[in-house]
Design a protein with these regions (language model features):
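Basic, amphipathic "hinge/linker" alpha-helix immediately C-terminal to the N-terminal HTH DNA-binding motif
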Residues: 1-13
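Generic secondary-structure signature for well-ordered alpha-helical cores
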Residues: 11, 15, 176-179
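Helix-turn-helix/homeodomain-like alpha-helical modules used for DNA recognition
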Residues: 14-65
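Primarily the HKD phosphodiesterase
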Residues: 57-115
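Short acidic/glycine-enriched loop/turn segments that link adjacent beta-strands
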Residues: 79, 132-134, 153-154
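Generic beta-sheet signal
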Residues: 98-100, 129, 147-148
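HKD-type phospholipase D/PLD-like phosphodiesterase module
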Residues: 102-140
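Amphipathic alpha-helical interface segments
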Residues: 139-189
Length: 189
């Protein structure tokens, strides 16, 4: 019994160490993660010699073929994210994206044509959160991602996985953010 507890403790310490860069910017959203979920996830961090590693991992996960369902949260405006979402949007893709008011305003200013095209798509729902968002997430066709951003909104790390426990946890994070958002059409000025 003591040995089993020690083994669990050791696994927890090893997981926390492996996830330290992610947890430095995303610890709060992980507080309610079910035991063992973080240990099932891959981690990708930015490094001096590979500062875009998390972004590249995101692009690999999203791919470039149409997906069935795409649900995401983003605290930033990114041409790369916009283009990757556009690449996987097919005729039958169900897509939801939650952003905060700041991201909405920056999107409308920086990418007005893309913003209008997205608004015209029947299968795309843009939702606006009242509270400022400080992490990102994505659930796409059985794969889940949570991304961490520093105080300057730079993507520092992401964790991802496709086990049922991981996908379920990230879906619950998504639903918790979504439940506090409204479709853009119902947004009060």
């Amino acid at each position: 019994m003591v040995h089993e507890q020690y083994e669990r403790f050791t696994e927890t310490v090893e997981c926390a160490d492996r996830m330290s860069e992610f947890l430095a910017d995303a610890a709060e959203i992980c507080e309610d993660a079910p035991p063992g979920v973080l240990g099932q996830m891959n981690i990708t961090t930015a490094a001096d010699n590979d500062p875009h590693a998390p972004l590249n991992r995101y692009l690999t996960i999203v791919g470039n073929e149409p997906v069935d369902r795409f649900r995401g949260v983003t605290p930033i405006v990114s041409r790369v994210f916009n283009e990757s979402a556009e690449a996987v949007l097919g005729e039958n893709t169900g897509m939801e994206l939650v952003v905060d008011r700041g991201v909405l305003e920056r999107s409308m200013d920086a990418y007005p044509d893309s913003f209008e095209r997205a608004r015209e798509l029947d299968q795309f729902e843009l939702r606006i959160a009242e509270e400022s968002l400080d992490f990102g997430l994505l659930v796409v066709d059985g794969h889940a991602v949570v991304s961490a951003y520093d105080e300057h909104n730079n993507l520092t790390a992401l964790v991802d996985g496709d086990t049922p426990e991981v996908v379920s946890w990230v879906e619950s994070l998504y639903e918790s953010v979504r439940s506090k958002s409204v479709p853009i059409d119902r947004l009060e000025p």
